[in-house]
Amino acid sequence: MTKDAESTMTVGTYLAQRLVEIGIKNHFVVPGDYNLRLLDFLEYYPGLSEIGCCNELNCAFAAEGYARSNGIACAVVTYSVGALTAFDGIGGAYAENLPVILVSGSPNTNDLSSGHLLHHTLGTHDFEYQMEIAKKLTCAAVAIKRAEDAPVMIDHAIRQAILQHKPVYIEIPTNMANQPCPVPGPISAVISPEISDKESLEKATDIAAELISKKEKPILLAGPKLRAAGAESAFVKLAEALNCAAFIMPAAKGFYSEEHKNYAGVYWGEVSSSETTKAVYESSDLVIGAGVLFNDYSTVGWRAAPNPNILLNSDYTSVSIPGYVFSRVYMAEFLELLAKKVSKKPATLEAYNKARPQTVVPKAAEPKAALNRVEVMRQIQGLVDSNTTLYAETGDSWFNGLQMKLPAGAKFEVEMQWGHIGWSVPSAMGYAVAAPERRTIVMVGDGSFQLTGQEISQMIRHKLPVLIFLLNNRGYTIEIQIHDGPYNRIQNWDFAAFCESLNGETGKAKGLHAKTGEELTSAIKVALQNKEGPTLIECAIDTDDCTQELVDWGKAVASANARPPTADN
């Protein structure tokens, strides 16, 4: 081997090596002529396997599901017709704080200034529109125009994804993947974490501890950014140090153990997990947030918006305390050091324990009675153990899922900031690819499923035993509760038959119908025996059968949506 050969590799191989080095074993793809050469380099790189997807939206959602389990993911699509579709799912990854590396092929560099019109474009000579969009939806976007620039640009994008917990975009022209570039340096330069500024960390924890010492009823609140910050264990340490009541936001379910002695429920305003949870939270004199995020959904149409004068919050890289903001203070380090500086503040935990809500176990329905939502959830609850990951689709599945009891080790996945119906099925596929040893269960409605259900095809292809409970109530239930109209009624499908229709000649998917509790029990037994592919159980329930929480929440959100314009807006 010559000296030059030892110091160079191709751009495609460079990207493949970096993906493997950061822990990616599978990349999700939809092929197109602008990315085919790149896909060859990725496919044949040791330790990296391709997962084909049915379309680019599903590809992006599958990658974000993989990132939920693996910590980071990669999706590869073609230019314009592929990437513009994928951007929807990448927007979700941005909103949900998930590092997904979106790689798009692009036209041959010789055509960019040639005056040629190219396919898969707008039919103009503007080839920058995709990059302009990508910059709005990612924390870093790079286009490799020269092979010698590839290492720095690829490393920069990957590092930003890791540091900012957001998606990034890498554009590689079709004639660039096979071009030589320098070999990579140590991966530590890309993945090494940043640490807090020591002086800022000390000052922030001192002021926070002093503020807490002056309060009688502080509480802790875990938010949706807690997991991405890697601060779950630090949150537990602070809960134990303060010995106060510790709550979670709905999008943080599963990030803090429901079996922990300080756990006090899901706070969600008037649709909180219990009246006791709501009362204790709202009587507190200081909310200590860890990665909290307040929007119109999480505040029930702004009715549960926090009082900023009593909110202390730690974000990824900053801490805000009434009257102060500290930059370069990382969440996990802040919570851990703060735990060493505070004393016990048990008033809120004592108040919660005095009126602790009793666990109500629903009675089994009559075996031959018409199936209803409560019976479906009762039987799903019986499947949830420490090895379960439960997906709750946007809609009433949110509220059904939040009522589930999670034992230690169980995980829960929602998409509450982006709120894209249809997200759960492709995301669960990606999750199951990353964590095949776990039991992945999906709760999804009929309307949501119709957007992305064909991704069951990849569950069949890769023999992923995902268990899908499809609640068929013949419409967009969440939209009905927010604002009803004929547009919320959909064409009914035979969803169980649809699932099996994707088997082809060799697939092992099972599609089953359940119209009674007895039939659901039998269907679950069949599902648990099917280890070679997914099982979809179509649960027929009444159109109006939904949680009261969805009804109440829907009215509040509808009211917020209907506010008339004001003079200042």
Swiss-Prot record:
Binding, Mg(2+): D446, N473, G475
Superkingdom of this protein's organism: Eukaryota
E.C. code: 4.1.1.1
Cofactors named for this entry: a metal cation; thiamine diphosphate
Gene3D superfamilies: 3.40.50.970, TPP-binding domain (3.40.50.1220)
Region of interest (Thiamine pyrophosphate binding), ranges: 396-478
Keyword Metal-binding: yes
Reaction(s) catalysed by this chain's protein: a 2-oxocarboxylate + H(+) = an aldehyde + CO2
Sequence positions that bind substrate: D33, H120, E479
Pfam families: TPP_enzyme_C (PF02775), TPP_enzyme_M (PF00205), TPP_enzyme_N (PF02776)
Cofactor note: Binds 1 metal ion per subunit.
Entry's Gene Ontology molecular function annotations: magnesium ion binding; pyruvate decarboxylase activity; thiamine pyrophosphate binding
Leader sequence segment: none
SUPFAM superfamilies linked: DHS-like NAD/FAD-binding domain, Thiamin diphosphate-binding fold (THDP-binding)
Residue positions, PTM Phosphoserine: S233, S522
One of the GO biological process terms: aromatic amino acid family catabolic process to alcohol via Ehrlich pathway
Residues modified to Phosphothreonine: T521
Entry's Gene Ontology cellular component terms: cytosol
InterPro entries per the UniProt record, alphabetical: DHS-like_NAD/FAD-binding_dom (IPR029035), PDC/IPDC-like (IPR012110), THDP-binding (IPR029061), Thiamin_PyroP_enz_cen_dom (IPR012000), Thiamin_PyroP_enz_TPP-bd_dom (IPR012001), TPP-bd_CS (IPR000399), TPP_enzyme_TPP-bd (IPR011766), TPP_PDC_IPDC (IPR047214)
Keyword tags: Decarboxylase, Lyase, Magnesium, Metal-binding, Phosphoprotein, Thiamine pyrophosphate
PANTHER family membership: PYRUVATE DECARBOXYLASE, PYRUVATE DECARBOXYLASE C186.09-RELATED
Family: Belongs to the TPP enzyme family.
Subunit-structure text: Homotetramer.
Identification of the protein by name: Probable pyruvate decarboxylase Pdc101
